[in-house]
């Protein structure tokens, strides 16, 4: 089979004209972000009582002649339905609609499961992110179900102001044969994944975020007030999810956006799990998620799971906001459990009483013994944290999920006394369930694809 010619694009992004202005009198830093429109540069003020220099700029300016691509046309016609082009970017070959005015720097992320672009919606005049889903993902049963699940949860939680969901969903047919090279599979083997002419490309449109929480953390842009308000917002939106009978399982700061009004939003729900589903399905696809934010009991593979999983997850993110860097840097479950023990000491016999796996129990027994207590370990790691922050960390980062503070207890803590707002603690008006998908975890990719097309495609 003939593979069409690859167009290689240069991806140098050396220019960066964002300005950082320090105002020592007001103890603020002002980041002026050039957004390719000299009349509308964005000004973001960030409180900085410590008056530290910003080590890295968050946003990289595009060239002045950059052209944001337009989203796929709303109306499909014989003239545009097959109008695509193939390009090469970061080791991946990607199909994109030919009439979209693609500029190299509009590509923001690329992987074997899809590619993301910055774009401008010509109808709303808003800057958006458009994600093209790889056909490879849609041909894998488990990956396709994960995509559908994300859409189902986004739709269910879209009423909450701290949830960011898709604006529209489009489908186009590929006009060319091309390869998608998967560099990051489990065996680290580079596999060519062929997409053929006529295969469907699915595009999702989202509002373009100002920042992600991960960017704010790693660039040390968070003030004490930022940390407090973001933690409070995160707790309230997760409480909303819990009220719908849903455990998030995979809260990641890279999937949490922040706008200029200091409003946090969750954007991804791929690993969310309804608490009313059978326990044997809980780990069906969970092994593919990162270990960095996972609670110990998810590694121990307990036969029960609770909302305390998310409390641990949020606790890790809270710790990262305080530190300005990763709390754990682990790639496998063994290393992760050792890293946890270095932070809060070894689990007690009572903590290990919930471990039912003999092999896991034996492994935990082999972890180097330590006299470190959770209190001492957390105080040692978070030397600059306040007393209230230490109390919250100790209440969230516990081996035993039964000993962790609940979301309600955390929200009622005195740490939030100056911003406490009951009106933010809303409940979902409907319990989430998969009643329309009784065999969801057995669905094949072709059926998943039909479900997405029937339920989520934007009418043309």
From Swiss-Prot:
Which top EC class is given? transferase
**Which family is this protein grouped under?**
Belongs to the protein kinase superfamily. CMGC Ser/Thr protein kinase family. MAP kinase subfamily.
Write out the residues that bind ATP.
Answer: 131, 154-162
E.C. number: 2.7.11.1
Record-given protein name: Probable serine/threonine-protein kinase kinase DDB_G0280557
UniProt key word Transmembrane helix: no
Please state every residue range assigned to the domain named Protein kinase.
102-416
- Which Gene Ontology terms of cellular component type are present? cytoplasm; nucleus
> Is the keyword Kinase assigned to this protein?
yes
Species in which this protein is naturally found: Dictyostelium discoideum
Could you tell me one molecular function GO term of this UniProt entry? Answer: protein serine kinase activity
Give the catalytic activity.
Answer: L-seryl-[protein] + ATP = O-phospho-L-seryl-[protein] + ADP + H(+); L-threonyl-[protein] + ATP = O-phospho-L-threonyl-[protein] + ADP + H(+)
Which SMART domains does this entry report, sorted A to Z? Answer: S_TKc
Biological process (GO) annotations held by this record are: intracellular signal transduction
**Keywords assigned by UniProt, alphabetized:** ATP-binding, Kinase, Nucleotide-binding, Serine/threonine-protein kinase, Transferase
- Origin: domain of life: Eukaryota
Q: Where is the active site?
A: 250
